[in-house]
């Protein structure tokens, strides 16, 4: 990908990067491990973004 990105695309990629994380530990503890992983996790090679 090009180094020089439009600002809108850069912001969308940053938002996707931030949302691609596990839930916090306190959520797992509070729900007694009922919630252990995020349904919206994305692997960089398997699923591509439409950004």
UniProtKB/Swiss-Prot annotation:
Protein name: Large ribosomal subunit protein eL39
Coiled-coil segments on the chain, per record: none
Keywords assigned by UniProt, alphabetized: Ribonucleoprotein, Ribosomal protein
GO biological process: translation
Cellular-component GO terms for this entry: ribonucleoprotein complex; ribosome
Species name: Pyrobaculum islandicum (strain DSM 4184 / JCM 9189 / GEO3)
Residues that span the membrane, as ranges: none
Homology family: Belongs to the eukaryotic ribosomal protein eL39 family.
């Amino acid at each position: 990908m090009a180094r020089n990105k439009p600002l809108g695309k850069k912001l969308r990629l940053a938002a996707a990067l931030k949302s691609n994380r596990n839930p916090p530990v306190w959520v797992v503890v509070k729900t007694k491990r009922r919630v252990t992983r995020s349904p919206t996790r994305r692997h960089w090679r398997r699923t591509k973004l439409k950004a």
